[in-house]
């Protein structure tokens, strides 16, 4: 059984980009769909979609490349099931001096650090993307 599905998602993305795959497939969950939505809104992936039936739903992410290089240079898990990292709206980190994003799980849903600051929300820091 998978202990940390978010780490698994990030690792699958990292590994697929390392071998220049166009798409990556993984088990689907609402949280993974929300993270994929933030990655799409911020321009780190081309698109995502659901596949499969209700017994084995899959999430398919279409990766984005620019001049042969992956748009995502680093994607790293911050909070984990063993050590959850929470930040208030004033403590939200700036990733690579604003060139990257932090994906935050707030009471209003999963969003980027910029959007959380705009809404005055803090929450669990899921990962950093740059």
From Swiss-Prot:
Keywords: Ribonucleoprotein, Ribosomal protein, RNA-binding, rRNA-binding. One of its GO terms (molecular function) is rRNA binding. Part of the 30S ribosomal subunit. Contacts proteins S5 and S12. PROSITE patterns: RIBOSOMAL_S8. This is Small ribosomal subunit protein uS8. Belongs to the universal ribosomal protein uS8 family. InterPro entries: Ribosomal_uS8 (IPR000630), Ribosomal_uS8_CS (IPR047863), Ribosomal_uS8_sf (IPR035987). The gene is rpsH. PANTHER family: 40S RIBOSOMAL PROTEIN S15A. One of the primary rRNA binding proteins, it binds directly to 16S rRNA central domain where it helps coordinate assembly of the platform of the 30S subunit. The keyword Ribosomal protein applies. One of its GO terms (cellular component) is ribosome. Coiled coil: none annotated. The keyword RNA-binding applies. One of its GO terms (biological process) is translation.
């Amino acid at each position: 059984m998978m202990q940390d599905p978010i780490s698994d998602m990030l690792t699958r993305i990292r590994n697929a980009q390392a071998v220049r795959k166009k798409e990556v497939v993984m088990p689907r969950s609402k949280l993974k769909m929300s993270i994929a939505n933030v990655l799409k809104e911020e321009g780190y992936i081309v698109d995502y979609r659901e596949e499969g039936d209700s017994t084995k739903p899959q999430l398919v992410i279409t990766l984005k490349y620019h001049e042969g290089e992956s748009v995502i240079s680093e994607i790293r898990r911050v909070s984990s099931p063993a050590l959850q990292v929470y930040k208030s709206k004033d403590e939200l980190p700036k990733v690579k001096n604003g060139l990257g994003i932090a994906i935050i799980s707030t009471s209003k849903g999963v969003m980027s650090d910029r959007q959380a600051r705009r809404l005055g929300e803090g929450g669990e820091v899921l990962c950093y993307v740059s």
